Amino acid sequence: MSRWRPPAEKSTALITPEGHARLKAELDELWRLRRPEVVRALAAAAAEGDRSENAEYTYRKKQLGEIDRRVRYLSKRLEALRVVDTAPTDPQAVFFGAQVELEDADSGELLRYRIVGPDETDAGRGWISIDSPLARALLKKRVDDEFEAQLPSGKHTFVVVVVEYAAT
């Protein structure tokens, strides 16, 4: 019997052209390179005889299952995604794809974020999902707008310093 999990929230089906290209490249690598490699290794492990005590065979079966699961996910997700490759009609306001610089009103610290789709978030690069609490609070704000965002660490006040969009 499987464990019950509450349904996951629907994520926004938006992605940047770069993010779409990365997901397609990952799918291509999994399907054309990694999967055939694992299938060959699995066949070699199966040829060794008794599969009940064959750790290599068990490992390769699990690895193949993980690859197939990711391939299915990426195939479905790429079909559902909408690539946003045009700048918004109002480049002074914060929308999907914006690179924003914020000032934390409490500490004065400057923070830089890019609002991207949920499939391309990267905390190290400052890329936050459009579904995140901060991005939701940021949408439609303009330079010098002050706003509050309810973050996991509590309520914070920010001021929008810069709004930029990458040239496409």
Curated annotation (Swiss-Prot):
Q: Which residues form a coiled coil?
A: none
Tell me the PROSITE patterns matching this sequence: GREAB_1, GREAB_2
Keywords (A to Z) from UniProt: DNA-binding, Transcription, Transcription regulation
Per the record, the gene is greB
Query: Could you tell me which cysteines form disulfide bridges?
Result: none
Q: What is the lineage of its organism?
A: Bacteria, Pseudomonadati, Pseudomonadota, Gammaproteobacteria, Lysobacterales
One of this protein's Pfam families, by short name?
GreA_GreB
GO molecular function list: DNA binding; RNA polymerase binding
Give the source species.
Xanthomonas campestris pv. campestris (strain ATCC 33913 / DSM 3586 / NCPPB 528 / LMG 568 / P 25)
Gene Ontology biological process: DNA-templated transcription elongation; regulation of DNA-templated transcription elongation
Which SUPFAM superfamilies does this UniProt record tie to the protein? FKBP-like (SSF54534), GreA transcript cleavage protein, N-terminal domain (SSF46557)
Q: What is this protein called?
A: Transcription elongation factor GreB
Name the family. Belongs to the GreA/GreB family. GreB subfamily.
HAMAP family, per the entry: GreA_GreB, GreB
Could you tell me what this protein does? Necessary for efficient RNA polymerase transcription elongation past template-encoded arresting sites. The arresting sites in DNA have the property of trapping a certain fraction of elongating RNA polymerases that pass through, resulting in locked ternary complexes. Cleavage of the nascent transcript by cleavage factors such as GreA or GreB allows the resumption of elongation from the new 3'terminus. GreB releases sequences of up to 9 nucleotides in length.
